[in-house]
Design a protein with these regions (language model features):
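Hydrophobic alpha-helical connector segments
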Residues: 62, 75-101, 146-147, 154
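An amphipathic alpha-helix adjacent to DNA-recognition modules
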Residues: 10-18, 30, 51-76, 80
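Hydrophobic/aromatic residues within well-ordered alpha-helical segments
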Residues: 12, 56, 63, 67, ...
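Hydrophobic/aromatic-rich alpha-helical bundle segments in the mid-to-C-terminal region
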Residues: 125-126, 139-180
């Protein structure tokens, strides 16, 4: 019998979260059952999926949270490293984000605005200010400005970027980016 390895378990669960998120994106929540999730994950039986998750609802919420954390990391990797990078970042990043993550963001929005998953959405989003503030401290250091001078502007930028990713509203984006 194989010995339980927490690192292998975590790695495999993360792979499942990625694949399950993709299954939901490809097929929608209603059209994605456990058999289809197993197929995406390469499992032969539902039991293998239950090794990692207690229910389909848990798969939905954990895969969305996992995707959002990955998105946040990507968002943070693209941050300006100097003042010279700032204009390019402000102008180009929202469009890159919409192109690469627009569908993901619409799906996340769909899940977290559903009455069924509203609490999980609140729980997840309640941690965002702390994560973003940590990120903004990093950007402030890179740009040699105070945290206080850019915090509100960066929150506005993040909101504008997400709004654009969801709805492709160029006017809203341009007005807010120009204000920043």
């Amino acid at each position: 019998m194989k010995k339980f390895d927490p690192a292998v378990y975590k790695k495999r669960k993360c792979e499942c979260l990625d694949k399950c998120f993709q299954a939901f994106m490809d097929n929608g929540l209603e059209n994605t059952g456990l058999q289809l999730l197993c197929k995406y994950c390469g499992f032969k039986t539902n039991q293998a999926l239950y090794h990692y998750f207690e229910s389909k609802d848990m798969i939905i919420t954990e895969s969305v949270q996992y995707a959002m954390i990955k998105f946040e990391r990507e968002f943070m990797k693209k941050a300006p490293r100097s003042r010279a990078d700032l204009k390019n970042y402000l102008e180009k990043f929202p469009r890159w984000m919409q192109k690469n993550y627009g569908e993901h963001m619409r799906f996340v929005y769909q899940v977290y605005t559903s009455p069924k998953y509203k609490k999980q959405g609140y729980d997840f989003f309640s941690g965002i200010p702390k994560r973003y503030d940590t990120f903004i401290h990093h950007i402030a250091k890179n740009l040699d400005v105070s945290f206080e001078s850019i915090q509100a502007l960066y929150y506005l930028y993040i909101t504008s970027t997400l709004q654009f990713a969801l709805f492709k509203d160029e006017v809203y984006l341009d007005v807010e980016v120009n204000a920043i």
